[in-house]
Amino acid sequence: INPSKAGAQMPECIKNPDPNEYIPIVENSRCLARWDAAPEMPGALQFGKYCAEKGILPSIAHTAAEYKDVKAAFEAGFTHVTHFYNAMPGFHNKGEYKYEGTVESVYLMDDMTVEVVADGIHVPPTIMRMCYKIKGVERMALITDALAVAAAGDDAQAFDPRVIIEAGVCKLA
């Protein structure tokens, strides 16, 4: 994943895809269904192509990808986006001009599916409605972002010291 979009991922655990590491994992596992990567990172397109060839869904996540990156990823086999809208940019400026971010680029890939955290906090209902209008029910999944402390109450202790729980919502401090 892209370290600049780590979100709740522990920065010290982030690294670029390395075939010397992921190939043995894939070859010795029978349960991998999906694996996330940021397509703009070194080795990510090769990783996505390998996963797709092995029947594992490569998914875009924690990314700063722009259109050229998303298009290259789609062509390499990435056909899904994890936690759409979260840990990825939308429109942004370079100087005085607007540029598409990951979000708009994904909307331009008609056959790319997305998953949206449907808690009304990660993504507001109005944006979920917009996503539904653009992607449709066939290409949009509603998911949770539940952690190990889900439904445990505000006094629960999270596994990561950066995580706090307030009013039933788990978030980074």
Which positions does each model-derived feature cover?
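Active-site-adjacent C-terminal substructures of enzyme catalytic domains
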Residues: D69-A173
